[in-house]
Swiss-Prot record:
Keyword Manganese attached: no
HAMAP family: Ribosomal_uL4_B
Organism listed in the record: Pseudomonas aeruginosa (strain ATCC 15692 / DSM 22644 / CIP 104116 / JCM 14847 / LMG 12228 / 1C / PRS 101 / PAO1)
Protein's UniProt name: Large ribosomal subunit protein uL4
PANTHER family found in the cross-reference section: 50S RIBOSOMAL PROTEIN L4, LARGE RIBOSOMAL SUBUNIT PROTEIN UL4M
Function description: One of the primary rRNA binding proteins, this protein initially binds near the 5'-end of the 23S rRNA. It is important during the early stages of 50S assembly. It makes multiple contacts with different domains of the 23S rRNA in the assembled 50S subunit and ribosome.
InterPro entries hit by this protein: Ribosomal_uL4 (IPR002136), Ribosomal_uL4-like (IPR013005), Ribosomal_uL4_dom_sf (IPR023574)
Keywords (A to Z) from UniProt: Ribonucleoprotein, Ribosomal protein, RNA-binding, rRNA-binding
Keyword presence, Membrane: no
One GO CC annotation: ribonucleoprotein complex
Gene that produces this protein: rplD
NCBIfam families registered for this protein in UniProt: rplD_bact
Length: 200
């Protein structure tokens, strides 16, 4: 299949990488797994045995007329422990590499179908200046965009750092969430080749 390149000749690309069917279930699974992996999972609360104090029985077992109590740190008391206390845990979800790559291929194919993938021959800025990048994006009519290059471009990264709706990634740093989060995805021809190499 062919991909149109902005201001240049169309390029031949792999049907497997850019022309497959959209698998919504798989993409959803990849997005959930990616976002779950980013969770810190360090929250912690104290159970009745962990709250300080409460060693002595508040009053004797029988004869007071009050409900029996063994500790002032019971979950039903003010200042007591939490009944089912949250503990630190990993939220990581297992996703095979094969499934992850298939999800990325599915997203790329859908971006092509929805005309959200903009391919350019090359994209760079001379200096790490936001103004220069904004002017360059304006000529392409792009506002909310993810820029994907084949390698890390420091000037481009620094120029985009202060723009709320612009992000810069290299191919290996692209993930399911960032690829679907923006209105448009701007990729260079060399990045397209790198995607084919990694996902082909």
């Amino acid at each position: 299949m062919q991909l149109n390149v902005n201001g240049a000749q169309a390029i031949e690309v792999s049907e497997r990488t850019f022309g497959g069917e959209f698998n919504e279930t798989l993409v959803h699974q990849a997005v959930v797994a990616y976002m779950a992996g980013g969770r810190q999972g360090s929250k912690a609360q104290k159970t009745r045995s962990e709250v300080s104090g409460g060693g002595k029985k508040p009053w004797r077992q029988k004869g007071t007329g009050r409900a029996r109590a063994g500790t002032i740190r019971s979950p039903i008391w003010r200042g007591g422990g939490t009944t089912f206390a949250a503990k630190p845990r990993s939220h990581e979800q297992k996703l095979n590499k094969k499934m992850y790559r298939a999800a990325l291929r599915s997203i790329l194919a859908e971006l092509v179908r929805l005309d959200r993938l903009v391919v350019v021959a090359d994209f760079a800025v001379d200096a790490p200046k936001t103004k220069g990048l904004v002017a360059k994006l304006d000529t392409l009519g792009l506002k909310d965009v993810l820029i994907v290059t084949d390698g890390v471009d420091e000037n481009l990264y620094l120029a985009a750092r202060n723009l709320a709706h612009v992000d810069v990634r290299d191919v290996q740093g692209s993930d399911p969430v960032s690829l679907i989060a923006y209105d448009k995805v701007l990729v260079t021809v060399s990045a397209v080749k790198k995607f084919e190499e990694l996902l082909g």
